[in-house]
Amino acid sequence: MPRFFLPRLSPPDMHISPSIFKAYDVRGIVPSTLNADVARALGRAFGMAARQAQQTTVAVGRDGRLSGPALSQALIAGLMDVGVSVIDIGQCTTPMLYFAASTLCASGIQVTGSHNPKDYNGFKMVLAGRAIYGAEIQALYQRIQAQDWQLQSGATLHEEDVLPAYRERILGDVKLKRPMKIVVDSGNGIAGATAPGIFRALGCEVI
């Protein structure tokens, strides 16, 4: 079972703005259009889509935004509500989540506001090996509106640090012809926690 406080179950009359369901992701302003209730409902909807695609496990990661932990916890709770097991990879870049969703399982969700201002957050989703978009994202909204899910027990949760394997994959793919001196500026992004170590492992001098 999850090792954290679970938000309350989404009330039947909960209003979710359709405006947060974009072409390629779900994205809103915290807490006015995006909160823990919305995240848990999305977890249930995505979990049902995963089950229909014969996916029993979903990887979940998040960027460094302050709203990330609460939204991630609620999302995980929603996935587990409908019987989908979760691999929580914690703070990571979106490429690291995609890596986890291709090596540890085949589906994943990254809690991220991408390039948007700090009060935004959102979800990028991979289902059965491919990013979902367009009609598939709108179908999640319709499922939430209809409360179209079946609660199911038996899901498991465990944490996984994917950085070592991710770094080794990069080191296996990239070979520098000469040493380089580079400056890394992640613009307050979560890559600031991972990129310098990866570049140093490649043989770069990082300033």
Regions found by a protein language model. Give the residues of each.
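Aromatic (phenylalanine/tyrosine) cluster motif
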Residues: F4-F5
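An N-terminal, well-structured beta->alpha segment
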Residues: P11-L75, D81-V82, E159-M180
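Ferredoxin-reductase
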Residues: Q54-A128
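Gly/Ser/Thr-enriched, mixed-charge loops and adjacent short helices
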Residues: N121-I207
